[in-house]
Amino acid sequence: FSAHAQSVPKPKEFYFDEDRAATPVVAVTGLAGDALVDELVKARERGRKMVEATAQLAHVAMADGRRDLGSQLYEQALGSTQSGGHLWRSISWNYGWDLYRAGEHQSALTRWAQLVTATGGPSWIPPTFALALWKLDRKAEAVAWYGAAVRTEPTLWTDARNFSTLLPDWAQEDRDTLAEVLGAWQANPPTWP
């Protein structure tokens, strides 16, 4: 337990910052399936938006259940960017979500934890960390991180009915899990600090 706990910093009091890098990396739009993969491979070969194409191809591979290939492509994309830069942060954020969706909750949390030092205090961190920590059965830490979301925006995060608006890209299953965290927070809200 203690080795895993070291991978996540303690929550700060507030997380108001917007993180413009917390968006999907997209090099090619309007295509799906094999046509999308073909265009992404061509973009990589031409060197146009090569890093973005590699990251999007990694996402496609992970979504298709090809975790090893997806991870290899994500690492290539990350290795081609400036550590801590906007594109690096965006790729890391996406990689974390793909790891999470693959059931690799600890790996996702570790990936996202790297972003805490690179980004400061973006508002996506508390609910995302709470979700991953809850999935890892680290309930007390999850509730503490959820508390940071509530301290930041108390009118938004104290009602699970807001989750579909606050987290439109999250799967309903993940919003339901976060509602469990909210329930635990309501039962015993942690004090600050």
Give, region by region, the residue ranges found by the protein language model.
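Short helix-adjacent coil turns
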Residues: 31, 65, 103, 137-138
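N-terminal leader/linker segments that initiate helical-solenoid repeat arrays
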Residues: 3-56
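Conserved positions within tetratricopeptide repeat
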Residues: 71, 109-110, 140-147, 175-180
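Short N-proximal segments of mature Sec-exported proteins
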Residues: 123-137
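Charge-rich, solvent-exposed alpha-helical interaction surfaces
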Residues: 36-39, 53-56, 73, 111, ...
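Flexible helix-coil transition and linker loops at the boundaries of alpha-helical arrays
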Residues: 38-47, 79-86, 156-159
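Alpha-helical adaptor scaffolds
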Residues: 25, 56-126, 148-151
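Terminal, low-structured helical/coil segments at or just beyond the last alpha-helical repeat
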Residues: 8, 151-193
